[in-house]
Structure formats: C-alpha cells, structure tokens
C-alpha cells in the first residue's frame, strides 16, 4: 500500500475541503484556527510533504530555507501569494500554487452589495435599526435611488469586472 502524502493545513478551511483532505492525505488540520508560529512552520517544513497556508500566514525565506526540509509544494489558500517568499521557494525547488479564481464571484457579489447599499441606503438603514434609531416608515425617508436602468461603468475587464457584468445584466 502506497503511503499517503503528509500535509499541514495552517488554518481552518471549509469543512468539505478539510474532509476531502483527511480522506485523501495524511492531513494535520489546525482545528484551533490560530496562526502558527514561525517555529511551528519551520517544524512543518521538516515533517510534511506539503504546506497549505492561507494568505495571512507569512511564509518567509527563513521558513522556506529550513535545513532538512521535506516540503515540496506550498498550496496557498487564496488568490494572492504575496505572503510567500517566491524567490526563496524557487531557490529551494518548492512549487507554489494558489487558487486564482476562487474569489471572483464572491468579490463581484460584494461589489453588487456595496452598489445596492449605497444606492438604496441599506447600510445607513441597517445602522439605524441596530442602534434602535428606527422610528418607522415614512414615504420618502431613506428612499435612496434605483439601480434599475442605470449604466454600470467598469474600469478594466478582468475576472471580477466580467463576473460583475454578468450579475448586472
């Protein structure tokens, strides 16, 4: 029987993902969801085949350049990877991956939420309700403006703008 790859997951990931990791690999999860210390990450580099950090985990040259390291791949959870010293990973022949499109639709949804919140004064209304300042309905109070029939201007047409344009159609 082939031995499963040992992986260290540095933070809490979605349950379905963690379940899949546990069945596919010899996975160690961070059930406390606390940031691992530099010393713990260095030890992880020595003890695991793969390190699965998030964008909030600084994976520095000191961590990557650990002597007697076992890690061959760093699979970052998130679109960005500026938390990882890429030059150090290259020098140490460690593959670095990320999830570039994982947040495209989510970010487009948030952009739509912000547009609706501003146009319809949603955030302002929510603030009044939470602070028990809501005095009841009045015909023109907090009316805002409709987004229907408006023109949406998008600067650049990257992944997020394209997704937003599909929501807005």
Residue ranges: model-predicted function:
Residues 140-168:
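Rossmann-like dinucleotide/phosphate-binding beta-alpha-beta segment
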Residues 100-151:
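Phosphate-binding beta-alpha-beta segment of Rossmann-like dinucleotide-binding domains, i.e.
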Residues 80, 102, 157-158:
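Short donor-sugar binding/catalytic loops of nucleotide-sugar-dependent glycosyltransferases
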Residues 19, 86, 126, 137, ...:
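Short glycine-/small-residue-rich flexible loop motifs, especially phosphate/cofactor-binding loops
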Residues 20, 110, 114, 163-167:
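Rossmann-fold NAD(P)-dependent oxidoreductase module
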Residues 15, 35, 105, 109, ...:
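Electropositive phosphate-/nucleotide-binding environments in soluble metabolic enzymes
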Residues 50-54, 77, 114-122, 158-159:
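Short, structured secondary-structure boundary patches
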Residues 2-97:
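An N-terminal-biased, well-structured beta-alpha scaffold segment characteristic
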């Amino acid at each position: 029987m082939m031995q499963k790859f040992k992986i260290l997951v540095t933070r809490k990931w979605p349950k379905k993902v963690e379940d899949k990791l546990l069945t596919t690999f010899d996975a160690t999860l961070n059930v406390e969801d606390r940031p691992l210390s530099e010393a713990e990450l260095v030890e992880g580099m020595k003890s695991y085949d793969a390190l699965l950090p998030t964008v909030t985990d600084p994976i520095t040259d000191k961590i990557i350049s650990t002597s007697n390291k076992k890690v061959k791949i760093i699979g970052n959870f998130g679109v960005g990877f500026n938390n990882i010293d890429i030059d150090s990973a290259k020098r140490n022949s460690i593959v670095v991956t990320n999830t570039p499109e994982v947040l495209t639709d989510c970010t487009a949804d948030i952009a739509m939420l912000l547009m609706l919140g501003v146009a319809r004064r949603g955030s302002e209304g929510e603030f009044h309700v939470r602070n028990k300042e809501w005095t009841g309905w009045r015909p023109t109070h907090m009316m805002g403006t409709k987004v229907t029939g408006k023109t949406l201007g998008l600067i650049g047409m990257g992944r997020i703008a394209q997704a937003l344009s599909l929501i807005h159609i």
